[in-house]
UniProtKB/Swiss-Prot annotation:
Descriptive protein name: DNA topoisomerase 1
Functional description taken from the UniProt entry: Releases the supercoiling and torsional tension of DNA, which is introduced during the DNA replication and transcription, by transiently cleaving and rejoining one strand of the DNA duplex. Introduces a single-strand break via transesterification at a target site in duplex DNA. The scissile phosphodiester is attacked by the catalytic tyrosine of the enzyme, resulting in the formation of a DNA-(5'-phosphotyrosyl)-enzyme intermediate and the expulsion of a 3'-OH DNA strand. The free DNA strand then undergoes passage around the unbroken strand, thus removing DNA supercoils.
UniProt domain Topo IA-type catalytic: residue ranges: 132-568
PROSITE patterns on file: TOPO_IA_1, TOPO_IA_2, TOPRIM
Catalytic activity: ATP-independent breakage of single-stranded DNA, followed by passage and rejoining
Length: 776
């Protein structure tokens, strides 16, 4: 009997039907050994000896593997064709050797295949190789690095920053990206700018729009028109001028298809087009690779999904070209196949790109046989694969340059049409933060043709901060920086969310306060180890180990000597020094530019500063113990914000009533006090919440009060002198009114939930000098 060992039962089931009765295919159910989560699993002083354990969960599977291996003439290790798969095979072989006293490595045969089809499986079994110790060593080195960072840095975090959970080698760098982007957004100052649109009519009475580009031979830059007055003055002048078509430019533009999918581009495109998380994409892709029941048989529908290679096999290209010719015609088929080269930093090109194993299985032919989400992802992969071998898209571009009678003013109108749809016939790539304007046609125009100006429209704009990272754009950024590998992107994103370091809201990552604390600490005290270049450099070293160009324990020693010294150094630092640094680094985030926001909202004389307690970080008044105000900046599971110490509440959540849509409103108890919640939490989507101010007794909270709290920030009215709106809100430091972009604290003597417009204007008048100083 020949024993074949794979990772999963699904994969075993698919492969089993391709092999004869002499083979028995069983599953290891993933890794059978791992480093236990305790001190001493990696021993730097013993040349980085690694103490692996068989988990309780894996025990019964190991017993079955060992039992079957005793009866086998040979063991075929058929795990996935990457470092992780090689590592699983190595662990299986080591356990069998240990349990059965097998001495010869010839007993084990490594078989690797990129797709689970009969042809690929038979070829792999007929052409086995030995285990690649370089790949195994690279995986062991990665595992050791992650362990050494996690089990030395995390305990230090717990001591120096109570409430922080752990720090991972690669996850911490991804977290830094998210936090730094949030810093950019917080510090961003929006600037006003204007442009001028001209609604024009040609001699055939057809309308089109042009944009003003030059005034008196001066090109208009983004900030040439900076306010409404400038824009209106220019608009008035333009209305008195007549325009004509000065010059028409026509050209064609070719657009080439994107390469077939690799792991990162599949995750990005599935996020954009399908709304899938990276984790969900990989779970579905795994199933499509391992085998799906399509009625008459179970078959692997796509090639291996963890890859950074963009190549396709010659056989696959031939099949794709044949289908293009048959289904779309020869005009959609280039004269020669398209060959792609990877743009990914340090791409291994070890595997093919992700493609269907049989291109003739069209999405339509499988629609009734696949789960809805399976179908969507398969369709995406199929279309991208077909498109990558199709002809270019050809665009006709037209630029009409317009001029006033003396050429004092110049304008431009652009138009584009698709002359030949090429690969667009099948597939278009999505963009993360931009939209293309296509088929924006101009009416027929002639040079020197007089035009009528139907309208001159000034358009106000404001510069916008950089967007928060989506899953797609974060994976793209990690890939550009050379951080992580195809097998790690999904887990990086999942771990950050599981640790509550980031939240995913409206499909964008927002750092939680806990995540910002960790990032500030690591950047301040372990800067080298969260540098992007350093982390990418470690990935390069792991690649070199996999290629047999670097000894893995030498790489570990090089890392550990510096990292351990850094740990010992920070261990000696006083917590007060660390708190001082963290507060300084978070000062802008916590208080903004306004120094007055540091004043305690309770006593109005003390100053707020960062403190650390056993439950995490909080702000406290410098007048303690006379003033006991405190405000948590790291929320618990309920993620509510509240000032003051939590008051006593009944253990049960209280239903106050329902809103106008019939959604229940709860008064709930959190670790930092009571809060209002709209509806129940479903999955990871957080319902709307509002803290109950310390000035309110929770026993007096009515449905009316709860609805008011949930409605904040709320418009009070319009200031009679400026026609600017006045808003009331409740923030980190209590109630406030917002007027002309400035914030004014509402003192305790006011009932802020029922603040009148007159009282609001009175507060503004009292703070007039401060507001003018800020605006100056």
């Amino acid at each position: 009997m020949k024993l074949v060992i794979v990772e999963s039962p699904a994969k075993a089931k698919t492969i089993n039907k391709y092999l004869g009765d002499e083979f028995k295919v069983i599953a290891s159910f993933g890794h059978i050994r791992d480093l236990p989560s305790k001190k001493g699993s990696v021993l730097p002083d013993e040349n980085f000896a690694m103490k692996y354990d068989i988990s309780d969960k894996a025990g019964k599977y190991v017993d079955a593997i060992v039992k079957d291996a005793k009866k086998a003439d040979a063991v075929y290790l058929a795990t996935d064709p990457d470092r992780e798969g090689e590592s699983i095979s190595w662990h299986v072989a080591e356990v069998i050797k240990e349990k059965n006293q097998v001495k010869s490595d010839d007993f084990f045969k490594r078989v690797a295949f990129n797709e689970i089809t009969k042809k690929a499986i038979i070829h792999a079994v007929e052409n086995p190789r030995k285990l690649d110790t370089n790949l195994v060593n690279a995986q062991q080195a990665r595992r050791a690095l992650d362990y050494l960072v996690g089990f030395t840095l995390s305990p230090l975090l717990w001591r120096k920053l109570p409430g922080c959970k752990s720090a991972g080698r690669v996850q911490s760098v991804a977290l830094r990206l998210i936090c730094e982007r949030e810093d950019e957004i917080e510090r961003f100052k929006s600037e006003e700018y204007w442009d001028i649109s001209l609604k024009m009519q040609n001699s055939n009475n057809e309308l089109f729009t042009a944009k003003l580009t030059h005034v008196n031979d001066q090109k208009l830059e983004k900030f040439s028109i900076i306010n409404e007055k400038n824009a209106k003055d220019l608009t008035k002048k333009l209305k008195s001028h007549k325009f004509h078509v000065d010059k028409i430019e026509k050209k064609q533009q070719k657009r080439q298809p994107q390469p077939p999918f690799i792991t990162s581009s599949l995750q990005q495109e599935a996020a954009r087009k399908l709304g899938f998380s990276a984790k969900k994409t990989m779970q579905i892709a795994q199933k499509l690779y391992e085998g799906v029941d399509i009625g008459k048989e179970t078959i692997g529908l796509i090639t291996y999904m963890r890859t950074d290679g963009v190549t396709l096999s010659n056989d696959a290209i031939a099949d794709i070209r044949k289908l293009i010719d048959k289904s779309y015609g020869d005009k959609y088929l280039p004269t020669s196949p398209r060959i792609y080269k990877s743009k990914v930093k340090n791409a291994q090109e070890a595997h093919e790109a992700i493609r269907p194993t049989n291109i003739t299985y069209t999405p339509d032919s499988l629609k009734e046989k696949l789960d809805k989400d399976y179908y969507k992802l398969y369709e995406l992969i199929w279309k991208r694969t077909i498109a990558c071998q199709m002809e270019n898209v050809i665009m006709d571009l037209v630029v009409a340059n317009l001029a006033s009678e003396n050429k004092e003013y110049l304008a431009k109108a652009n138009g584009s049409t698709i002359a030949f749809d090429g690969f667009y016939k099948v597939y278009r790539e999505s963009m993360d933060d931009e939209a293309e304007e296509e088929n924006k046609m101009l009416p027929p125009l002639k040079e020197q043709e007089p035009l009528k100006t139907k309208a001159v429209i000034p358009n106000q704009h404001f510069t916008e901060p950089p967007p928060r990272y989506s899953e797609a754009s974060l994976v793209k950024k990690l890939e550009e920086l050379g951080i992580g590998r195809p097998s790690t992107y999904a887990s990086i994103l999942s771990v950050l969310q599981d640790r509550k370091y980031v939240a995913l809201e409206k499909k964008r990552f927002i750092p939680e306060e806990l995540g910002r604390l960790v990032t500030v600490f690591l950047v301040g005290f372990f800067k080298k180890y969260v540098e992007y270049d350093f982390t990418a450099g470690l990935e390069n070293e792991l690649d070199a180990i996999a290629a047999g160009k670097l000894e893995w324990k030498a790489a570990l020693n090089n890392f550990w000597s510096g990292f351990n010294h850094n740990i010992e150094s920070v261990n000696e630092q006083k917590i007060t020094e660390i708190i001082s640094y963290v507060q300084k680094a978070l000062d802008y985030h916590l208080f903004g530019e306004n120094k007055e926001s540091k004043i305690c909202p309770s006593c109005n004389t003390g100053e707020l500063s960062l403190k650390l307690g056993k439950f995490g970080a909080f702000l406290a008044c410098s007048n303690y113990p006379e003033c006991t105000f405190r405000k948590s900046i790291v929320s618990g599971n309920d993620n509510n914000e509240n000032e003051g110490e939590p008051a006593a509440m009944p253990n049960e959540n209280k239903v106050l009533g329902t809103d106008k849509d019939g959604v229940e409103i709860y008064l709930k108890k959190g670790p930092y006090g009571p809060y209002i919640q709209l509806g129940k939490q479903e999955g990871k989507v957080k319902p709307k919440r509002s803290p109950v101010p310390a000035s309110l007794n929770q026993n007096d909270i009515t449905l009316d009060i709860a609805l008011k709290l949930l409605s904040l920030p709320l418009k009070i009215g319009i200031h009679k002198d400026s026609d600017e709106e006045i808003m009331i809100g409740y923030g980190k430091f209590g109630p406030y009114i917002k007027y002309m972009g400035q914030f004014i604290s509402v003192q305790k003597k006011y009932d802020f939930l029922n603040l009148s417009l007159d009282d609001a204007m009175k507060l503004i008048e009292e703070n007039k000098a401060k507001l003018e100083k800020k605006q100056a």
